[in-house]
């Protein structure tokens, strides 16, 4: 069957060889404002939007996620389980002509799987790249992006509740003592959140989201040059 590769809103015919995969987390507490699957919803939104704008193939989401052992705010998997699912998606993607894979990751803990990317490239003789778009956990940036894509309940009362760090210790990781003790970057971010609190900034959310989508679009353009 001869496929009409130039049809539709696509950058060019080469873009059909690029596949986009969303990577995040489905089971994490995000305070009162955001749902437990915030990370994968943001990753999926960005990945799908970039796919629509370029014509690259959106291949779906990775269901498992992983996390540093000292960060306890959800239910996660071993890095090997994430790798196994990525391997499945890449194997299926290759069957439909994808040769270059771009993973859009919006969960910090998943950075642990980056070491497996070369293994995937070697096994399947393909190119794999990963873009990490992460935020201070359940803080102003993530709340604002979540609001723009429609997943945040950010009325005044809920935001006030969200800023109760004793009830929601995962917000900014302010109350996650073990995580703060083991990671200086987490501790630094937590201090900022505790001092200034979490707010809704619609303009900031729009700016971050648009910049993230543009970053993925530019990477896709780079991959088909």
Swiss-Prot record:
Keyword Endoplasmic reticulum assigned to the entry: answer is no
Q: What residues does Fe cation 2 bind to?
A: 30, 39
Q: Which InterPro entries match?
A: Creatininase-like_sf, Creatininase/forma_Hydrolase, FAPy_deformylase
Q: Which Pfam families match?
A: Creatininase
Field pH dependence: Optimum pH is 7-8. Has approximately 80% maximal activity at pH 6.5 and 40% activity at pH 8.5.
Signal peptide (UniProt feature, chain positions)? none
- Cofactor notes: Requires one Fe(2+) ion for activity.
Cofactor list: Fe(2+); Zn(2+)
- The answer, when asked if Manganese is one of the entry's keywords, is no
The disulfide bonds in this chain are none
Q: Which UniProt keywords apply?
A: Hydrolase, Iron, Metal-binding, Zinc
Molecular function in Gene Ontology:
2-amino-5-formylamino-6-(5-phosphoribosylamino)pyrimidin-4(3H)-one formate-lyase activity; ferrous iron binding; hydrolase activity, acting on carbon-nitrogen (but not peptide) bonds, in linear amides; protein homodimerization activity
Q: Which residues bind Fe cation 1?
A: 28, 39, 107
Catalyzed reactions per annotation: 2-amino-5-formylamino-6-(5-phospho-D-ribosylamino)pyrimidin-4(3H)-one + H2O = 2,5-diamino-6-(1-D-ribosylamino)pyrimidin-4(3H)-one 5'-phosphate + formate + H(+)
Identify the HAMAP family for this entry.
FAPy_deform (MF_02116)
Per its database record, what is this protein's job? Answer: Catalyzes the hydrolysis of the formamide of 2-amino-5-formylamino-6-ribosylamino-4(3H)-pyrimidinone 5'-monophosphate (FAPy) to form 2,5-diamino-6-ribosylamino-4(3H)-pyrimidinone 5'-phosphate (APy).
Name the UniProt record assigns to this protein: 2-amino-5-formylamino-6-ribosylaminopyrimidin-4(3H)-one 5'-monophosphate deformylase
Record gene name = arfB
């Amino acid at each position: 069957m001869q496929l009409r590769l130039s049809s539709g809103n696509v950058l060019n015919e080469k873009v059909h060889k690029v596949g986009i995969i969303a990577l995040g987390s489905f089971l994490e507490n995000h305070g009162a404002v955001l749902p437990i699957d915030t990370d994968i919803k943001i990753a999926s939104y960005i990945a799908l939007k970039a796919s629509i704008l370029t014509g690259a193939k959106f291949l779906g989401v990775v269901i498992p996620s992983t996390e540093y052992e000292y960060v306890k705010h959800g239910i996660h998997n071993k890095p090997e389980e994430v790798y196994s699912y990525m391997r499945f998606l890449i194997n299926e993607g290759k069957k439909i002509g994808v040769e270059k894979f771009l993973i859009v990751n919006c969960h910090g803990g998943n950075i642990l799987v980056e070491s497996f990317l070369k293994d995937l490239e070697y096994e399947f003789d393909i190119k794999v790249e990963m873009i990490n778009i992460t935020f201070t956990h359940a803080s102003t940036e993530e709340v604002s992006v979540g609001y723009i894509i429609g997943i945040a309940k950010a009325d005044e009362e809920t935001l006030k509740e969200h800023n109760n760090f004793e009830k929601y210790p995962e917000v900014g990781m302010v109350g996650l003592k073990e995580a703060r003790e083991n990671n200086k970057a987490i501790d630094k971010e937590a201090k900022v959140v505790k001092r200034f609190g979490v707010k809704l900034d619609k303009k900031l959310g729009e700016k971050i989201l648009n910049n993230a989508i543009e970053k993925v679009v530019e990477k896709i353009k780079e991959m088909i040059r």
